[in-house]
Design a protein with these regions (language model features):
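N-terminal secretory signal peptides that target proteins for export/translocation
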Residues: 1-12
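Surface-exposed binding/hinge segments that line
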Residues: 126, 160-205, 220-229
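Extracellular/periplasmic catalytic domains that process cell-envelope and extracellular macromolecules
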Residues: 57-61, 114-120, 170-173, 216-217, ...
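Gly/Pro-rich hinge or "lid" segments in bacterial periplasmic/extracellular proteins
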Residues: 71, 91-104, 193-258
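Bacterial N-terminal signal peptides
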Residues: 15-27
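Solvent-exposed coil/turn segments that connect beta secondary-structure elements
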Residues: 41-44, 53, 69-72, 80, ...
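N-terminal lobe/hinge region of extracytoplasmic solute-binding protein
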Residues: 31-119, 126, 149, 218
Length: 258
């Protein structure tokens, strides 16, 4: 082989190697995103201030009363036992939250940003440092890992089905969690995992998650339970100190006091 041919092949090999490295870097690392969509880009950009369908200056106050058929005997809506109280979901939050004016898009709630490689083989959530539970403790990666495991092992069968294609969950930092998916073509998996409610490990780890309970749970959402009487009523009160009240996804929402 002549020296010229060797140099040519060497340059081609070097160029090919560089292209492969660049491609792998693109697949392995995704820039942090404020929101994700199943196809294309989400409607709202990274600097949006509120959803279009809300009044960001809506006054706070007042009461709303709703009728519910039947009774309730538990404040744990995540297992198969008992009848959860209507509206109990207002106590809990998910990593991401959808908007009401577009399909298959989600934006950061507990998660401040999301990282997804081009092939959607994983999703990484970066949690907001200000995110807190009602008891004042910070929401961390440990809470996310705990929530995933307890929902999958002791929650309703829905969660086992939902998370069946999650191959691995890793804590990358105090506020960073990575979900790696099994091989396949399900582009919806990052959105599915983003809908996962985040529960307090401190509160739940020494309690029976599979049991019915009327002990008021620790959540992180915009409302707390003010008072209740089983079989008759439950009153939710807006949390004045709710950590997420000024987030773009929440601005103009949760205006009723009770």
């Amino acid at each position: 082989m002549t020296r010229a041919k060797y140099r040519c092949r060497h340059r081609l090999a070097a160029g090919w190697f560089g292209w492969v490295c660049a491609l792998l870097a693109t697949v392995a690392v995704g820039a942090p995103l404020h929101g994700i969509a199943l196809h294309g880009q989400p409607k709202y950009g990274p600097n949006f201030e509120h959803f279009d369908y809300v009044n960001p200056n809506a006054p706070k106050g007042g009461e709303a009363r709703f009728a519910a058929i039947g009774s309730f005997d538990t404040f744990n809506p995540f297992n198969i036992k008992g009848q959860p109280a209507a509206g109990i979901g207002q106590l809990f939050e998910t990593l991401l939250i959808g908007s009401a004016d577009e399909p298959f898009s989600e934006y950061g709630l507990i998660a401040e940003s999301v990282e997804i490689p081009e092939d959607r083989s994983s999703v990484t959530f970066n949690l907001r440092p200000q995110a807190k539970f009602h008891d004042g403790t910070s929401i961390t990666a440990d809470d996310v890992l705990f929530s995933f495991e307890i929902l999958k092992t002791k929650g309703t069968p829905l969660y086992r089905f939902y998370y069946a294609n999650v191959a691995k969950v890793e804590k990358l930092g105090e506020r960073q969690v990575k979900f790696t998916f099994a091989p396949g073509e399900n582009r919806e998996l990052p959105l599915i995992v983003g809908q996962m409610p985040v529960l307090s490990e401190k509160y739940w780890r020494d309690r029976d998650f599979a049991a019915t309970t009327l002990e008021v749970p620790v959540g992180s959402g915009p409302y707390r339970i003010e008072r209740f009487e089983p079989g008759r009523f439950i009153v939710y009160q807006r949390d004045e100190n709710y950590w997420g009240k000024d987030l773009p996804v929440n601005r103009g929402r949760y205006n009723i006091d009770r």
